[in-house]
């Protein structure tokens, strides 16, 4: 799996079909930046991966809390 594949898979898992804008907001980057990564116009910076892991952890915690309330 390439880095772009990983980014797409995680973006979709976190935010659904329209994942690019919400992911960009969470990372504090422009939507265009995410699109450039996907097109391989610019490399995905190494610091993005730990930031994505932290975003996934926060969203997982929110989901678990919501699930527990059911």
PLM feature spans:
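Residue-level detection of beta-strand scaffold positions
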Residues: 9-10, 14, 21, 38, ...
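Short alpha-helical DNA-recognition segment
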Residues: 17-35
């Amino acid at each position: 799996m390439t880095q772009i594949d990983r980014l797409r898979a995680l973006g979709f898992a976190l935010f659904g079909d329209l994942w690019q804008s919400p992911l960009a907001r969470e990372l504090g980057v422009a939507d265009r930046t995410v699109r450039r990564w996907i097109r391989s116009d610019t490399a995905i910076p190494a610091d993005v991966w730990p930031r994505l892991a932290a975003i996934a952890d926060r969203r997982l915690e929110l989901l678990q809390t919501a699930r527990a309330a059911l």
